From Swiss-Prot:
The keyword Heme does not apply. Substrate binds at residues 13-18. The keyword tRNA processing applies. Its cofactor is Mg(2+). HAMAP family: IPP_trans. Residues 36-39 are annotated as: Interaction with substrate tRNA. The lineage of its organism: Bacteria, Bacillati, Bacillota, Clostridia, Peptostreptococcales. Belongs to the IPP transferase family. Keywords: ATP-binding, Magnesium, Nucleotide-binding, Transferase, tRNA processing. This is tRNA dimethylallyltransferase. It comes from Clostridioides difficile (strain 630) (Peptoclostridium difficile). GO terms for molecular function: ATP binding; tRNA dimethylallyltransferase activity. The gene is miaA.
């Protein structure tokens, strides 16, 4: 059976994925599947830098505004829904463009990760529960941070069930020291991985500027509205960068200025971790946006690369 080409456009936060993804989709007759763990949530628009309807320019997007902020969305569920949408898009004879920077979401499509198998791994779960009883939640949360810092940052340490579940996913059928070791490529798809990057200082400037724009556009008001709607601060969705810092400002833990600076700092650190993650994709083609006169020049070069890559 012919593999479905899976065009994956990724890169660190604020690099410029959204604009380019729309241009690529329009030129390649593609529909877009979002691989962003924050844009999945309704009502969380400003802090997630969610693509707007106007920005979409009529290009169909999937896995945006998919669930309410109190829904415990998992990597396993992302994989199930994304696979369903991939087949729907393919049936329409359109290209599939996956765009976003959540590494675990991308891995769940690139590699043959069987979450049903991890669901059945009772022995591992019992061992983790035993460690939890002996060493406590702080130890377990720190262990998760070593394996998957992004999930650890989003899962509150008091949510023991989610911490254990995330550790199960990380530890199922692989070596602990490298998430993608021992994983085989998904045989259904031909992943064509494109990683966007920029000069580090320029990227950090863009991150700082984006945070300033989020604040100006009403991030504080967005968080207040979420609280007024009954969404709690210990929810997974509320642990996202931008949201957790504003919550601490509203609780009086940070000043307004401190909250903004910490969002910028944490976003820069996140970008650095993302770049490290993407370097594991040995077949990926990297493009430095700062080396191009304009976005159309870059878009045309990427389209040529994609056409040459499709088997």
């Amino acid at each position: 059976m012919k593999k479905i080409p899976l065009i994956i456009l990724t890169g660190p936060t604020a690099v410029g994925k959204t604009d380019l993804s729309i241009k690529l989709a329009k030129d390649m007759n593609a529909e877009i599947i979002s691989a962003d763990s924050m844009q999945i949530y309704e009502y969380m628009d400003i802090g997630s830098a969610k693509v707007t309807e106007k920005e979409m320019q009529g290009v169909k997007h999937y896995l945006i505004d998919e669930v309410k902020p109190d829904y415990p969305f998992s990597v396993s569920e992302f994989q199930q829904r994304a696979k369903k949408y991939i087949h729907e898009i393919n049936k329409k004879e359109k290209c599939v463009l996956v765009t976003g920077g959540t590494g675990l979401y991308l891995n769940s499509l690139i590699y043959n990760m069987d979450f049903a198998q991890s669901d059945a791994n009772n022995e591992l779960r019992e061992e983790l529960q035993k460690q939890l009883a002996e060493k406590g939640i702080d130890y377990m949360h720190n262990k998760l941070k070593e394996l998957d810092e992004e999930s650890a940052n989003r899962i509150h340490k008091n949510n023991t069930k989610r911490v254990i579940r995330a550790l199960e996913v990380c530890l199922s059928g692989k070596k602990m020291n490298d998430f993608s070791s021992d994983l085989k490529f998904n045989e259904e798809y031909q992943p064509i991985i494109i990683v966007l990057n920029r000069d580090r200082e320029h990227l950090y400037q863009r991150i700082n500027m984006r945070v300033d724009i989020m604040i100006k556009n009403g991030l504080v008001e967005e968080v207040k509205k979420l609280l007024s709607m009954g969404f709690k601060k210990d929810m997974i969705s509320m642990q996202g960068i931008g949201y957790k810092e504003i919550l601490k400002y509203l609780d009086g833990e940070y000043t307004y200025e401190e909250a903004i600076e910490i969002i910028k700092r944490d976003s820069r650190r996140y970008a650095k971790r993302q770049i490290t993650w993407f370097k594991r994709y040995k077949t990926a083609k990297w493009f430095d946006l700062d080396q191009y006169e304009n976005i159309d020049e870059l878009k045309n070069e990427i389209i040529l690369y994609i056409k040459d890559s499709i088997k």
